[in-house]
């Protein structure tokens, strides 16, 4: 995690930027329509809750990877109950601390569900957080909603589920993956994006070099037939991950050269280091600015 001195150093840079719409899913005013698609035997992808949710059903209950936004928790619970062999939820994984992943924590925590997360995710959920670049505030979760089982490196829930730490700093500093070997499905949260540019949450440990490292980790866990479920957007292939790794690797190299030459975030944006990807990915300015700031955060941890 970042120390307070780093936050003081970076706060001015973040506050000076123009607030832009966050790439995280926006709150919906009315009850969402939860969609369901089968990924494999007893494995389903639920969409529309604020982020992708993976559900494994079975005689011993349901395992969820992520829980959508809090305002969609009831609708998601109804959709899960309607799945074949639905049953009660017994385990929830939080792939990281963002509200699109942790919105069902309180509802399920009150029901006695085991909530698993990487230890850094639990620590972030115990405190109030304000993003300095746009002022967005996140309240700490109630005790009952916080992960009640954490790990540092990796673990096994049962023979059909393995999980592990993606990287010490990727999208955040607490990203995890959940792998279903029998179906060859890998859920990775926002360590990979299915659409648009990712959020580089340097305030809670993410950085552009870590995004590259996280994709390398995902590729090492997967194989060429693996289906990869990102935090948002459609299911990805091994080839998609390789393409993302190439793209973010190129951008990281260019930004690293700029910061070593003393460029500012605005100069980095103006240099258009992601120009060849804009037609497919959209306007990268916010992503480039956050990525450049993340280099400051990572390279100057005690500034």
Task: Locate the predicted segments by residue.
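N-terminal secretory signal peptides and thylakoid transit peptides that target proteins
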Residues: 1-17
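Accessory terminal helices/loops
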Residues: 2, 17, 21-26, 220-227, ...
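C-terminal segment of N-terminal export signals and the immediately downstream linker at the start
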Residues: 21-47
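Conserved beta-strand hairpin/beta-sheet module of binuclear metal-dependent hydrolase folds
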Residues: 37-87, 177-190
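Divalent metal-coordination and catalytic microenvironments
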Residues: 42, 56, 66, 96, ...
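Metallo-beta-lactamase
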Residues: 61-62, 69-71, 166-250, 254-257
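Short catalytic-loop micro-motif centered on adjacent basic/acidic residues
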Residues: 63-66, 91-94, 162-163
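Active-site HxH/HxHxD metal-binding segment of metal-dependent hydrolases
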Residues: 81-154
């Amino acid at each position: 995690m970042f120390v307070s001195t780093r936050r003081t150093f970076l706060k001015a840079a973040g506050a000076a930027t123009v607030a832009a719409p966050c790439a995280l899913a926006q709150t919906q005013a009315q009850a969402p329509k939860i969609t369901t698609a089968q990924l494999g035997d007893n494995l389903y992808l639920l969409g529309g809750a604020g982020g992708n949710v993976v559900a494994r059903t079975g005689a011993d209950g349901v395992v969820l990877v992520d829980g959508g936004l809090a305002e969609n928790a009831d609708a998601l619970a109804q959709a899960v109950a309607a799945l074949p062999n639905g049953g009660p939820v017994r385990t929830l994984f939080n792939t990281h601390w963002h509200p699109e992943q942790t919105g069902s924590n309180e509802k399920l925590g009150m029901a006695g569900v085991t909530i698993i997360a990487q230890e850094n995710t639990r620590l972030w959920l115990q405190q109030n957080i304000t993003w300095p670049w746009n002022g967005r505030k996140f309240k700490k979760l109630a005790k009952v909603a916080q992960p009640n089982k954490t790990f540092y490196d990796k673990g096994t829930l049962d023979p059909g589920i393995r999980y592990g730490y993606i990287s010490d700093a990727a999208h955040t500093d607490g990203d995890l993956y959940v792998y279903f070997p029998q179906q060859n499905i890998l859920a990775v949260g926002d360590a990979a994006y299915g659409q648009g540019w990712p959020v580089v949450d340097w305030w809670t440990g993410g950085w552009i070099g870590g995004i590259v490292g996280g994709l390398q980790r995902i590729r090492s866990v997967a194989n060429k037939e693996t289906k990869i479920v990102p935090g948002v957007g459609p299911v990805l292939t091994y080839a998609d991950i390789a393409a993302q790794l190439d793209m973010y690797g190129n951008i990281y190299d260019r930004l690293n050269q700029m910061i070593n030459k003393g460029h500012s975030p605005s100069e980095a944006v103006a240099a258009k280091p992601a120009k060849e990807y804009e037609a497919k990915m959209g306007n990268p300015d916010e992503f480039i600015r956050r990525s450049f700031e993340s280099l400051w955060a990572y390279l100057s941890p005690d500034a």
